[in-house]
Curated annotation (Swiss-Prot):
One of its GO terms (molecular function) is rRNA binding. GO terms for cellular component: large ribosomal subunit. The gene is rplB. One of the primary rRNA binding proteins. Required for association of the 30S and 50S subunits to form the 70S ribosome, for tRNA binding and peptide bond formation. It has been suggested to have peptidyltransferase activity; this is somewhat controversial. Makes several contacts with the 16S rRNA in the 70S ribosome. SUPFAM superfamilies: Nucleic acid-binding proteins (SSF50249), Translation proteins SH3-like domain (SSF50104). The lineage of its organism: Bacteria, Bacillati, Bacillota, Bacilli, Lactobacillales. Keywords: Ribonucleoprotein, Ribosomal protein, RNA-binding, rRNA-binding. This is Large ribosomal subunit protein uL2. Part of the 50S ribosomal subunit. Forms a bridge to the 30S subunit in the 70S ribosome. It comes from Lactococcus lactis subsp. lactis (strain IL1403) (Streptococcus lactis). Residues 219-268 are annotated as: Disordered. It comes from the Bacteria. Belongs to the universal ribosomal protein uL2 family.
């Protein structure tokens, strides 16, 4: 992926950058793998906002991604590399030798015409999926399962990767992108390689309109609200927070407060936390 820099022909275009989409091979998705999406604008069934800053945006269709990769020992050929509006990573359309088509996350280095396969006997090659127990120490992986057969849940965004550090009993030690070291069942599957489109984080949207096209609404500062809307609100002119520390709109400390559930059963599987 390359970064395209726009000429400053207008104020909105100044400093704007975007992807050159050099890796994309087609603009037409596989129709059988598309699902309609309805917008909720962050509202629940009662019509109240439960997620702020959601709404608007370009109409999308969901691409059904195969995060499980359970079609074992059947070779699949990469047909296309496509753009997916629902995620930062690109996706690859693969066609199995039995004719079945599916989408997978496109790892770095995967190209049209290459083959991928899943299963315990699969080679350690980019795009192949196999159990953690069969992956050598030091290998970079992505799309990692937390429960066997549930499908990949970790390391799925553009440019992300994790590294296998070793095994301990029925668990495999994996260092995640954040630096956290976690024990994951060795029967869980992962895909070899780094997620592609790694320069996506360097894109400068340049103007508010591009953010609105993505379905993200403005974030309003609490200090410019009324006191009944936010703990920081009210006062004549610009005023300080007026509390010991900044607060969330619901009156809880906004900075430094640990949000992890102390009773989470998975805590015993975390060997090294992010800040240790």
């Amino acid at each position: 992926m390359g970064i395209k820099v726009y000429k400053p022909t207008t104020n909105g275009r100044r400093n704007m950058t975007g992807s050159d989409f050099a890796e994309i091979t087609t603009s037409t998705p596989e129709k059988s793998l598309l699902v309609s999406m309805s917008k909720t604008a962050g509202r629940n069934n009662t019509g109240r906002i439960t997620v702020r800053h959601h709404g608007g945006g370009h109409k999308r269709k969901y691409r059904v991604i195969d995060f499980k990769r359970t079609t074992d020992n059947v070779v699949a050929k990469v047909a296309t590399i496509e753009y997916d509006p629902n995620r930062t990573a690109n996706i690859a359309l693969i066609v199995y030798s039995n004719g079945v088509k599916s989408y997978i996350l496109a790892p770095k280095g995967l190209e049209v015409g290459m083959t991928v396969v899943s299963g315990p006997e699969a080679d350690i090659k980019v795009g192949n999926a196999l159990p953690l127990a069969n992956i050598p120490v030091g290998t970079l992986i992505h799309n990692i399962e937390l429960k066997p057969g549930k499908g990949g849940q970790l390391v799925r965004s553009a440019g992300a990767s994790a590294q296998v550090l070793g095994s301990e009993g029925k668990y495999t030690l994996v260092r995640l992108q954040s630096g956290e070291v976690r024990m994951i069942l060795s029967t869980c599957r992962a895909t070899i390689g780094v997620v592609g489109n790694e320069q996506q984080s360097l894109i400068n949207l340049g103007k508010a309109g591009r953010t609105r096209h993505m379905g993200i609404r403005p974030t309003v500062r609490g200090s410019v609200m009324n006191p009944n809307d936010h703990p920081h609100g009210g006062g004549e002119g610009r005023q300080p927070v007026g509390r010991k520390s900044p607060m969330t709109p619901w009156g809880k400390p906004a900075l430094g407060l640990k949000t992890r559930n102390k009773k989470a059963k998975s805590s015993k599987l975390i060997v090294r936390r992010i800040n240790d």
